[in-house]
Amino acid sequence: SSSRDFGSMLKFITRTKPHVFSEVIYHVQVSTLLDMGYLSKVNYYPMNPTGWNELNLKINTTGADYTDKSVQKEYERIDFYSYIVHIVQRLMNPKAGGKRKGILVFTRFLKEAERLTMSIPGCVIVSGDTPKKERERILEMFKVGEIPVVANVGVLTTGFDYPELDTVVMARPTMSLAMYYQIVGRCIRPHKDKEAAWFVDLCGNINRFGEVSDLHLKDTGNGKWAVFS
């Protein structure tokens, strides 16, 4: 992975205005938390679809991520929609590892999520347009196993507490280390009944950023901390 400064992830600590904190007095690396059992073991599965070409993705004007248009064009070119369905169906009936507790799919656009709900019985969409109470109802049903798959569009990267969750599918490319870290974080919470979570990446993100254990905090000088992968 490239050593790129993603210090904006820690902006709230030492770079806020007004200046509340001036220094970080203690830090712990993710790899240490994994070794100590405070985070769940994660098995990483990079599964790019045949023909996927990251060179076709264009960077937006801010340089922060890929343009919607280029991502949609690549999806259409390789029929990414059918591939997502194929992968999720395989995960629902794995050849090894036992039945998954729940499958949370992260998509970039509504179209992929709709394709999943059309093809997989019981799959439900959660998006920014889903009313709060309806979202809470869906997630509670997901947690107790009444909903096997949740396809979420641009939400649930933070604030979703479900330690038993053992399968996350990242069905969207990103240049944002913060987003990648947050998405992996949905399945990294430890639970006594979870031996290891599965993180299935369909868009080259593992190759881009590495495993979460590869992330490390570093003081880049003048109290400005950054995250590197």
Name each region found by the language model.
Residues 1-44:
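Post-DEXD/H (motif II) to motif III coupling segment of the RecA-like Helicase ATP-binding lobe
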Residues 173, 178-182, 186-217:
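Conserved segment of the helicase C-terminal RecA-like domain
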Residues 70-123:
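Conserved strand-helix element at the start of the C-terminal RecA-like helicase core
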Residues 37, 149-169, 184-192:
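SF2 helicase motor core recognition
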Residues 104-106, 112-158:
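Conserved helicase ATPase core of P-loop NTP-dependent helicases/translocases
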Residues 21-23, 39-43, 121-122, 163-167, ...:
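Short glycine-/polar-rich loops that comprise or flank the Walker A/P-loop
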